[in-house]
């Protein structure tokens, strides 16, 4: 397979004109050459934080607070999940995953409610789709063993010492929501020595220093934070200190579109477009433990090809800014998957 156009090559997403040669699902080489193609070849996206279980309840709960919406065990989301049938939950999740694939997402890191059964539903929903659904289970240690890691709701919600120890012993990642509504759960979350934190909207200087010193990655979800009215994460400060990835959070609140998340962050912050695209691709892939990420020889071929001559993108002078600030699912010409 040969893909031509402007290639966003390597971890620095360097735009080069040429072709990507793919053989047996892997990138064999990248050749710089003049080409007539106007396509933009970008690493596939990795949505680093989702809750796709609430795909059954899109746009439910308008006007509710964060706690009323999602706090376990009786936030609106959790009540709706309990009321829904297994068939409806799996079908709704599958449709969200199908949309992710169509919009160029290769993987999502899903905080999976529902204990062992929830992990099994996610596996069923993803079966046969070219999206790697990483199950960060919750509810029990058994769920963690059934899934790919443990995704804790927050250190103010429960004590997670046993789950943390079991996850470490199993050699799996432990992630936790922290600093979303306020700073009160950041210290206990950091004491758990997580592989990554989610949200970190309200860090104090000491939290930022510790995140930097301990090299703890952070996933930010700015659209979700605005919807739930908890504030805006200090993304510029976080990017200076650690690896930052990008997620869309609950499907009930936001579409799982990395295009929308990137554009929103680009226009909300002063973070450069190249760094935002790295957050949505390379950094997320690292967090997911995926072999893909940068477009470079030897990597699995997971790319999204955008039509640079679409009515939306034609005339763009900067391909990285075009992808981050302007592109959308309608501009996707092809999703290349080695899965």
Predicted region positions:
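Short, acidic/polar
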Residues: 85-99, 136-143, 181-186
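C-terminal cap of metal-dependent C-N hydrolases
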Residues: 8, 300-339
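Alpha-helical scaffold segments that flank or form the walls of functional sites
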Residues: 40, 56-128
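Divalent metal-coordination and catalytic microenvironments
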Residues: 5-6, 20, 25, 49, ...
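His/Asp/Glu-enriched, well-ordered alpha-helical/loop segment
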Residues: 191-192, 234-312
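N-terminal metal-binding scaffold of metallo-dependent hydrolase/deaminase domains
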Residues: 1-34
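N-terminal cap/recognition module
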Residues: 32-64
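Active-site core of metal-dependent hydrolases
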Residues: 141-234, 239-252, 271
């Amino acid at each position: 397979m040969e893909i031509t156009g402007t290639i966003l090559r390597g971890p620095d997403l360097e735009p080069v004109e040429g072709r990507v040669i793919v053989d047996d699902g892997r990138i064999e080489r990248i050749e710089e050459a003049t080409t007539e193609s106007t396509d933009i070849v970008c690493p596939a996206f990795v949505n680093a934080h989702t809750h796709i279980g609430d795909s059954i309840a899109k746009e439910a709960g308008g006007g509710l607070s964060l706690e009323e919406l999602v706090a376990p065990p009786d936030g609106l989301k959790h009540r709706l999940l309990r009321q829904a049938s297994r068939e409806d939950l799996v079908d709704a999740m599958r449709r969200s995953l199908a949309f992710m694939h169509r919009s160029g997402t290769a993987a999502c890191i899903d905080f999976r409610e529902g204990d062992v059964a929830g992990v099994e539903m996610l596996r069923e929903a993803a079966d046969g789709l070219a999206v790697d659904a990483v199950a960060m289970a919750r509810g029990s240690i058994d769920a963690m063993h059934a899934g790919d890691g443990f995704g804790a709701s927050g250190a103010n919600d429960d004590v997670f010492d046993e789950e943390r120890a079991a996850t470490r012993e199993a050699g799996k990642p432990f992630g936790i929501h922290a600093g979303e509504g306020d700073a009160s759960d950041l210290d206990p979350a950091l004491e758990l020595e997580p592989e990554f934190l989610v949200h970190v909207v309200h860090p104090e200087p000491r939290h930022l220093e510790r995140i930097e010193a301990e090299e703890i990655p952070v996933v930010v979800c700015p659209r979700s934070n605005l919807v739930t009215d908890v504030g805006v994460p200090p993304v510029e400060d976080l990017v200076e200190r650690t690896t930052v990835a990008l997620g869309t959070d609950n499907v009930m609140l936001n579409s799982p579109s990395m295009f929308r998340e990137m554009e929103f962050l680009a226009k909300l912050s002063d973070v450069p477009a190249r760094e935002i695209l790295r957050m949505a691709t390379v950094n997320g892939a690292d967090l997911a433990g995926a072999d893909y990420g940068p477009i470079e020889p030897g990597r699995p071929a997971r790319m999204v090809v955008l039509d640079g001559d679409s009515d939306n993108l034609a005339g763009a002078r900067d391909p990285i800014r075009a992808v981050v600030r302007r592109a959308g699912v309608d501009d996707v010409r092809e999703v290349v998957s080695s899965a």
